[in-house]
Amino acid sequence: MTVHIGAAPGDIAETVLMPGDPLRAKWAAERFLENPVCVNEVRGMLGFTGMWRGNRVTIHGSGMGMPSLSIYANELLRDYGAKTLIRIGSCGAMQADVKLRDVILAMTASTLSTPSSGIFRELNYAPCADYGLLQAAYKAAEGKGSPIHVGGIYSSDVFYDERPDLNEQMVRHGVLAVEMEAAELYTLAARHKARALAVLTVSDHLLTEEALPSEERQSSFSDMVEIALEAAFS
């Protein structure tokens, strides 16, 4: 048990999928895992452990933003011995050829700031995904026929960002999408010698201002979860 996770030793699997929304963690566990058991509900942040095709998996919420994810990822890696963390979540597309419901595999995650930025000081650290996970996820997505994009994303600390100039530069430099967690996830995984990947579904589009209706978001995320699970155990 840690300050923010109430799970007992051994309750957390070495492979953890991390949606931002704790209710999405519950939905994914009930839909994809056999015999899921709730292992954490401290502060309403739900975590479940169960089996998928004979493999033990935990699905645990991270909350919104890098400061929140940093708390849970640190404790999962440091105190519970997690070896593989895969973020499953939504993102906003920043390129014209990326469409709603497409899946994005984040090869790199640029950011202005993470909770780890004070460690690096003047160094412009470049967080990146684990290549083995990235390759496995790409193959899994290809097998499903899912529209998929691989490349850099941007992790923002601010949801309501009033920086149109920054967005323009992201688009100009080929950044695929914006979200709020992956840069810190990749940084922490590197520090703890673990594997990490962000598998994202496009729910909004910054260029066209399109957005998935709330009732479609959950049903559109099934491919993303299956890709993450297949990548983790390929």
Curated annotation (Swiss-Prot):
Give the residue range of the signal peptide. none
Binding sites annotated in the UniProt record for a purine D-ribonucleoside: H4, E162, E179, M180, E181, S203, D204
Site feature: Important for catalytic activity: R217
GO MF annotations in UniProt:
purine-nucleoside phosphorylase activity
Q: Which UniProt keywords apply?
A: Glycosyltransferase, Transferase
The reaction(s) annotated as catalysed by this protein in its Swiss-Prot or TrEMBL entry are: a purine D-ribonucleoside + phosphate = a purine nucleobase + alpha-D-ribose 1-phosphate; a purine 2'-deoxy-D-ribonucleoside + phosphate = a purine nucleobase + 2-deoxy-alpha-D-ribose 1-phosphate
* Gene3D superfamilies the UniProt entry points to: Nucleoside phosphorylase domain (3.40.50.1580)
Listed EC numbers: 2.4.2.1
One GO term describing the cellular component: cytosol
Per the record, the domain of life is Bacteria
What the entry lists under InterPro entries is as follows: DeoD-type, Nucleoside_phosphorylase_CS, Nucleoside_phosphorylase_d, Nucleoside_phosphorylase_sf
> Is the keyword Phosphoprotein assigned to this protein?
no
Chain sites annotated for binding phosphate:
G20, R24, R43, R87, I88, G89, S90
Active site location: D204
One Pfam family matching this protein? PNP_UDP_1
| Family to which the UniProt record says this protein belongs | Belongs to the PNP/UDP phosphorylase family.
Q: What function does the entry list?
A: Catalyzes the reversible phosphorolytic breakdown of the N-glycosidic bond in the beta-(deoxy)ribonucleoside molecules, with the formation of the corresponding free purine bases and pentose-1-phosphate.
Assembly, in brief, is: Homohexamer; trimer of homodimers.
Protein name per its UniProtKB record:
Purine nucleoside phosphorylase DeoD-type
Q: What gene name is given for the protein in this entry?
A: deoD
